[in-house]
């Protein structure tokens, strides 16, 4: 199970690509980190 971390703008819409499942999300100021696990 690989983990992938994606950084996007806090208000940006993000959809996990096929084969990945979001497992956590954190905000830091204007940034948002989305943690994905390979399915």
Residue ranges and their predicted role:
Residues 1-39:
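Class I S-adenosyl-L-methionine-dependent methyltransferase catalytic core
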């Amino acid at each position: 199970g690989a983990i992938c971390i994606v950084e996007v703008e806090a208000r940006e819409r993000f959809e996990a690509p096929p084969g990945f499942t979001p497992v956590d999300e954190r905000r830091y100021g204007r940034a948002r980190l989305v943690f994905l696990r390979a399915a």
